[in-house]
Design a protein with these regions (language model features):
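Short amphipathic
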Residues: 10-20
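Short hydrophobic/aromatic-rich motifs at helix boundaries and adjacent loops
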Residues: 5, 13-15, 29-30
Length: 98
């Protein structure tokens, strides 16, 4: 069994590509931030060496994620792997300009 410190230190990462034809604009970014806040782990989008809090709509919009842009979805904490898995699937579901 992992110690609490080991669980809190769990880090998960996944490269993601934005598929929405309008990019990660306000509506999907707001949904993404809302879902990211549901996890106990801290979650970030990392792009071009900069980290943006996935729990903040403003931070997500600052990342300027247009269609085809790539970023690393990174989470640290006890549910990091679940956060990365579920949030990466959510990003893939934002299609057709919605």
């Amino acid at each position: 069994m992992k110690s609490k410190a080991a669980e809190d230190a769990t880090v998960a990462r996944r490269e993601v590509t934005i598929v929405n034809e309008l990019g990660l604009h306000a509506r999907p970014a707001a949904e993404f931030a809302r879902r990211a806040r549901a996890f106990r782990s801290e979650v970030w989008l990392v792009r071009e060496g900069k980290r943006f809090s996935a729990a903040s709509l403003i931070e997500i919009l600052r990342a300027n994620l247009d269609q085809g842009a790539t970023a690393t979805l990174e989470a640290k904490g006890r549910d990091a792997e679940a956060a990365v898995e579920k949030l990466s699937r959510l990003l893939e579901s934002f299609k057709d300009g919605k």
